Amino acid sequence: MSDAYKNAGVDIEAGYEAVKRMKKHVERTQRLGVMGSLGGFGGMFDLSELPYQKPVLISGTDGVGTKLKLAFSMDKHDTIGVDAVAMCVNDVLAQGAEPLFFLDYLAVGKADPVKIEQIVQGVADGCEQSGSALIGGETAEMPGLYTADEYDIAGFSVGVAEKDEIVTGEHIEEGHLLIGLTSSGLHSNGFSLVRKVLLDDGGLDLDTVYEPFARPLGEELLEPTRIYVKPVLKAVKSGKVDGMAHVTGGGFIENIPRMLPDGLSAEIDHGSWPIPPIFPFLQEHGKLKEEEMFNVFNMGIGFVLAVKEEDLTGVIDTLEAQGEKAYLIGRVKRGEGISFGGAALS
């Protein structure tokens, strides 16, 4: 039967080998609360081992999108897993949750044990950065749906917060200040536009080093998404963070207003933080308006916190003590949506 299945495009033995290779990466993500080991039908986690009095589970799921196409082109697969974890754990973090465990779903055109191990290595790296245990997942070989070199990855994160410490944004008021945490670059959003502007229309080469970068363009674009969990949780535990936003698809314009109560808006001081060079590089090559850039990309700020004015210095000090670079990027005002002060948008 296995020979017939292999002739149909599914290599069971390669799948077994991939599982063997990923075990050591899974094991280094273990944490308090994990029950059982890799290979069960379901991942188990004992919440009673953690010191929560009224725990509320907060979950999130996401993928990496068409950033994967660049990984295929570069044949570089060891950081895409970090992106998959980051997109999920940063979302649950925005509600004040401590990520507990993570599951991944990997669909491949052909089971290549070495490539699968590289992908899962990245997932485990992301789990370590976020304090999450990788307690399960699925790797599906799907010939005919994906080409031999293609795959897709998605993840699912579950976190926990004390019921009376969940960060919902409901306590944000006019006058709250906005703290921005720097991104590592594009993160995992807007890559359909990136590929069109730089590769399809621009004809640029992923293996070439362009000014102002110090490495090939493909490596610049594949820089993994930052994971903000550990420093931000330190700030959240102070009780002085009233709202948070993960700046993902939709950029500033869609994501920052998501944390605000009705009747309030965000005024952003454009120019109050350094914008990484990948963004003006992309804007110049695509002749994109700045408003569109802020509506698609993170523009150098991957996570935003809302705090009272009197708490600003303390929260920034806490974040920077954890190695974060934090900027005062704006404030909350009456109104709807988002506006930009400082340097005008073009």
Curated annotation (Swiss-Prot):
Enzyme class, UniProt record, top EC level: ligase
UniProt GO BP: 'de novo' IMP biosynthetic process; adenine biosynthetic process
Pfam family, one: AIRS_C
Tagged with keyword Transmembrane helix: no
Main subcellular location: cytoplasm
Entry's Gene Ontology molecular function annotations: ATP binding; phosphoribosylamine-glycine ligase activity; phosphoribosylformylglycinamidine cyclo-ligase activity
Listed PANTHER family: TRIFUNCTIONAL PURINE BIOSYNTHETIC PROTEIN ADENOSINE-3, TRIFUNCTIONAL PURINE BIOSYNTHETIC PROTEIN ADENOSINE-3-RELATED
Name recorded for this polypeptide: Phosphoribosylformylglycinamidine cyclo-ligase
Species this chain originates from: Bacillus velezensis (strain DSM 23117 / BGSC 10A6 / LMG 26770 / FZB42)
